[in-house]
Amino acid sequence: MATIEFSPGIPEVPTQVRLLKSKTGKRGSAIFRFEELKSDTQSILGMRMIDEEGELTTRNIKAKFLNGEFKALEVIYDMETEAEWERFLRFMERFSAANQMGMA
């Protein structure tokens, strides 16, 4: 089963995921938005995407606040090669199937 975690053992589901790819097709990014978290936002150091192939990680995380109140986390996962892009897509296929998410 594919999961996303900020804290070990606490699965999270993003509110939105956007995919971007360069014109050359070599580089890409996935931008995750999380508006409701189970994890304590004070202890988040990175995001882990875990499935049967292993683990993908990123530490590119930005918290969004409005009038001092937490609104969302924005996480960016960058892919530098076609192999990284393909690996990420395999993870997202598993994750979306496990969490009843669709593509728009």
Swiss-Prot record:
It is a peripheral membrane protein. It holds the Pfam family Psb28. GO terms for biological process: photosynthesis. InterPro entries: Psb28_c1_sf, PSII_Psb28_class-1. GO terms for cellular component: photosystem II oxygen evolving complex; plasma membrane-derived thylakoid membrane. Keywords: Membrane, Photosynthesis, Photosystem II, Thylakoid. Gene3D superfamilies: Photosystem II Psb28. It is found in: Cellular thylakoid membrane. The keyword Thylakoid applies. Part of the photosystem II complex. Belongs to the Psb28 family. NCBIfam families: PS_II_psb28. This is Photosystem II reaction center Psb28 protein. It comes from Synechococcus sp. (strain JA-3-3Ab) (Cyanobacteria bacterium Yellowstone A-Prime).
